[in-house]
């Protein structure tokens, strides 16, 4: 099974590398072309502990700027894009909206039945239900899986998670649990 990731920032990169270490084939995308080129060359500009070792020992991860490729080639696609806080305390989910729009645009041309989108970034109450409604016609299942981590200990926090929350039901639910037990 191939796992996709859209949003390969600090958290996304750590998560993708741990999923790869657990034995999955991973295709990770980000919209920052220079950043992806650096990752493809093995150049890493982060001080996050343990990431260098994970990147250099990885054998089955590929980096791209092509979200469409991730959506078409992968069965389960995690999105860990930025959702910054707004002044009113809510979250700006426009980056997640963009990912859902990518699914919709591809769904017009290519059947997406059986694929799952796992929203791993912080969202507002009700957002995942909205994303699911937008993806129903494409046959995509939406799960909510927020990460509980701190900058500077992302890898450690993912490996030693106090809890894992997976909201949603569908054919990939059990596989999501396996992924999380695999990275721990």
Task: Map each language-model feature to its residues.
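Nucleotide donor/acceptor-binding cores
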Residues: 1, 115, 162
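NAD(P)+-binding Rossmann beta1-loop-alpha1 motif at the extreme N-terminus of oxidoreductases
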Residues: 1-43, 63
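N-terminal glycine-rich dinucleotide-binding loop that anchors FAD/FMN and/or NAD(P) in oxidoreductases
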Residues: 43-62
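Short amphipathic alpha-helix with an adjacent loop that forms part of the alpha/beta core around
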Residues: 67-70
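An anion/phosphate-binding loop that grips the pyrophosphate of nucleotide cofactors and donors
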Residues: 73-74
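N-terminal Rossmann-like NAD(P) cofactor-binding module of classical short-chain dehydrogenase/reductase
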Residues: 77-78
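Rossmann-like NAD(P)(H) cofactor-binding subdomain of soluble oxidoreductases
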Residues: 84-153
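Internal alpha-helical scaffold of NAD(P)-dependent oxidoreductase catalytic cores
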Residues: 129-143, 154-184
């Amino acid at each position: 099974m191939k796992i996709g990731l859209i949003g390969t920032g600090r958290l996304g990169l750590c998560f993708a590398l741990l999923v790869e270490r657990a034995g999955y084939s991973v295709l990770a995308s980000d919209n920052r072309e220079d950043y992806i080129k650096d990752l493809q060359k093995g150049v890493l500009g982060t001080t996050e502990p343990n990431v260098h070792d994970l990147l250099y020992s990885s054998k089955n991860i590929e980096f791209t700027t092509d979200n469409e490729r991730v959506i078409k080639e992968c069965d389960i696609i995690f999105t860990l894009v930025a959702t910054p806080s707004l002044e009113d305390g809510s979250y700006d989910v426009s980056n997640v909206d963009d990912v859902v729009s990518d699914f919709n645009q591809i769904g017009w041309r290519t059947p997406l039945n059986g694929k799952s989108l796992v929203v791993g970034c912080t969202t507002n109450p009700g957002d995942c239900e909205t994303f699911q409604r937008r993806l129903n016609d494409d046959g995509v299942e939406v799960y909510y899986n927020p990460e509980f981590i701190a900058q500077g200990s992302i890898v450690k926090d993912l490996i030693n998670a106090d809890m894992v929350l997976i909201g949603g039901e569908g054919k990939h639910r059990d596989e999501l649990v396996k992924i999380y037990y695999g990275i721990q």
